[in-house]
Amino acid sequence: MKIIRKNHPLLKIINHSFIDLPTPSNISSWWNFGSLLGICLMIQILTGLFLAMHYTSDTTTAFSSVAHICRDVNYGWLIRYLHANGASMFFICLFIHVGRGIYYGSYVLSETWNIGIILFFTTMATAFVGYVLPWGQMSFWGATVITNLLSAIPYIGTTLVEWIWGGFSVDKATLTRFFAFHFILPFIITAFVLVHLLFLHETGSNNPSGLNSDSDKIPFHPYYTIKDLLGILLLLMALMILALFFPDVLGDPDNFTPANPLNTPAHIKPXWYFLFAYAILRSIPNKLGGVLALILSILILAAFPLLNTSKQHGLIYRPITQTIYWTFIANLLILTWIGGQPVKYPFTMXGXIASITYFIIIIILMPMSNTIENNIIKL
């Protein structure tokens, strides 16, 4: 008798991707975050769909429609807070996923890595346009400040900003198109995720030892399905605790005030997951320079496969690069903290130092430590 999952044209694809997929036997819990990101994406699409049924993308009613969802819709408050805090969980998983990729040298699978960078940019774009939708003070001013950065582009900047706004300021046209973008982008992300998985399954997964694991593979199901299930349960528990006990802890108090173009908040800042990039943007006095640094802060991830000269895969047996890696993580946390602080001394100075350190570590220190460790091996 033929096994249906191995012969059916559609089930065969699922079987090769999630059931009979040969997987290294030693991958640790740090490899769980890929599946957790998939779950986060599904949660966001489902909760977002139900929110879109009640939300109105009009400047006069957007704020009150969000209030209506929380007060009058059955479990609307839960759907709204799961969606808002689900975004935070998404980015926590995303940062850990990228961090693991850097630590264990997953960037050598360059196609998968580069699609991952595109996914990172797309997710950031989705989160940004989504943050604007509740039409609170920070939503409005965040949209105004960040879109205005495009005016730094020589010659076409001002025209480009007015084109994105749909007028001469952030208004009804802007909100409507941002809602349209926010609705379509998660499906574009889903398409890129499939390409990401396609490239990954072409080469096979990396593993903590950094050695070739072809001689030691096990089927994905049941070993890693059970392991992923545990991760998913922990993620859902963390998300539920966040959404039910501390729903507004990661939000901004200014967003409880409806958008007012005549009143600027004291400190304009984006959501916490953008603060590191925002700190890099603010640390450069020149507008165009700041925008380029902002883009480079993520795009520099593409440099990892190019700058890697190490004879060893991953950092597990490389103490010098390990130290530099953890310095990089600490520096990233400092940037995140500084991004949320007001623009005054000593934060401006510390932000500029942390921004320079961020790029120096990736471009200079990591390749240098690779060379040093290669020479130590030769001794």
Swiss-Prot record:
A ubiquinone binds at H201. Heme b b562 binds at H83, H182. Heme b b566 binds at H97, H196. CDD domains: cytochrome_b_C, Cytochrome_b_N. The chain crosses the membrane at residues 33-53, 77-98, 113-133, 178-198, 226-246, 288-308, 320-340, 347-367. InterPro entries: Cyt_b/b6_C (IPR005798), Cyt_b/b6_C_sf (IPR036150), Cyt_b/b6_N (IPR005797), Cytb/b6-like_sf (IPR027387), Cytochrome_b (IPR030689), Cytochrome_b_C_euk/bac (IPR048260), Cytochrome_b_N_euk/bac (IPR048259), Di-haem_cyt_TM (IPR016174). The gene is MT-CYB. Signal peptide: none annotated. Keywords: Electron transport, Heme, Iron, Membrane, Metal-binding, Mitochondrion, Mitochondrion inner membrane, Respiratory chain, Transmembrane, Transmembrane helix, Transport, Ubiquinone. Component of the ubiquinol-cytochrome c reductase complex (complex III or cytochrome b-c1 complex) that is part of the mitochondrial respiratory chain. The b-c1 complex mediates electron transfer from ubiquinol to cytochrome c. Contributes to the generation of a proton gradient across the mitochondrial membrane that is then used for ATP synthesis. Heme 1 (or BL or b562) is low-potential and absorbs at about 562 nm, and heme 2 (or BH or b566) is high-potential and absorbs at about 566 nm. This is Cytochrome b. One of its GO terms (biological process) is mitochondrial electron transport, ubiquinol to cytochrome c. Binds 2 heme b groups non-covalently. It is found in: Mitochondrion inner membrane. One of its GO terms (molecular function) is metal ion binding. PROSITE patterns: CYTB_CTER, CYTB_NTER. Disulfide bonds: none annotated. Its main location: mitochondrion. Its cofactor is heme b.
